[in-house]
């Protein structure tokens, strides 16, 4: 798939999935090799201001010369905005290579009779994979799946 086809695929996900359990998300990450393991994760929850708090945390960590992955939503212009490494959205090339890895894991899940990941789960897995591949020290997340 090329970049445009990958975006189209992701945008179609809500049409054929239902909300999955936290165990499903954990299983999905296991198939990907648990890319989140060994990272320091800052998980921000609350009613208002999550995006601002996450952006502030990212700035603080970058000021301290730490490497930071930041997964946020929604995007304004481009889906890449949701996945940032050291303050920059990932490139189209990195988006596509990460998509390919996650898409392959989805095919394995489907072959094993497991349900397709949701839109959120798919992008979350892409973010964790991109962060692992980039070797970030810290991951900043806005709450998803009810804070779990």
Regions found by a protein language model. Give the residues of each.
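Short functional linear segments
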Residues: 1-46, 53-66, 71, 110-114
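Electropositive phosphate-/nucleotide-binding environments in soluble metabolic enzymes
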Residues: 4, 19-22, 51, 89-92, ...
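Conserved phosphate-binding and hydrolysis motifs of nucleotide-dependent enzymes
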Residues: 46-49, 142-144
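Short active-site-proximal "capping" loops at secondary-structure junctions
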Residues: 48-50, 75-76
